[in-house]
Each structure stands twice: as C-alpha cells, then as structure tokens.
Amino acid sequence: MAVPKKRKSKSRANSQNHVWKREIVKQARRAVSLAKALLGGNTNFLLVSPGPTTPIKPNPKKQTGRRPRSQRRRT
C-alpha cells in the first residue's frame, strides 16, 4: 500500500527558499553591474562588436507556421 512521504518542515522549506533567493539576487547584481560597465564604457574584459554594417534580410524561403495540407506528411 502506498504511504505518503514525510512533509518538509516549514523552517527547512523557508531556509532552502532563502538560499535560492540569495543566489538569484547575487546573479541579478552581477548582471546590473556588467550592464552599467558596458553602458559606461568602463570595461576592458569584454569585446563588444559595433554590429553589422549591412542590415540582415529575412530568408524569404523560410516557412513559418503549419504546412499547407498538400505538403503535410502522411503517417
């Protein structure tokens, strides 16, 4: 017969959630710091290319969405 698992205590769940949230905050701070450095030009460890000189044209042959009924595979 199936036996339900033990419930995790509220304090343990809160503790684990706090660890997750702390890591998220740390990553967010790093991202904001990097963005500030890039916008301010205060970084020399990252090479930023100026972007393409000619605009990139979309591929006209690329199909989007579903195929027409006549071109669908029959299974």
UniProtKB/Swiss-Prot annotation:
Annotated stretches, region: Disordered: 49-75
A biological-process GO annotation: translation
Disulfide bonds listed in the record: none
Keywords: Chloroplast, Plastid, Ribonucleoprotein, Ribosomal protein
Cellular localisation: Plastid, Chloroplast
Top-rank taxon, per record: Eukaryota
Record GO cellular component, one term: chloroplast
Primary site of residence: plastid
Bias type Basic residues, positions: 59-75
Single GO MF descriptor: structural constituent of ribosome
Family: Belongs to the bacterial ribosomal protein bL32 family.
Annotated protein name in UniProt: Large ribosomal subunit protein bL32c
Gene: rpl32
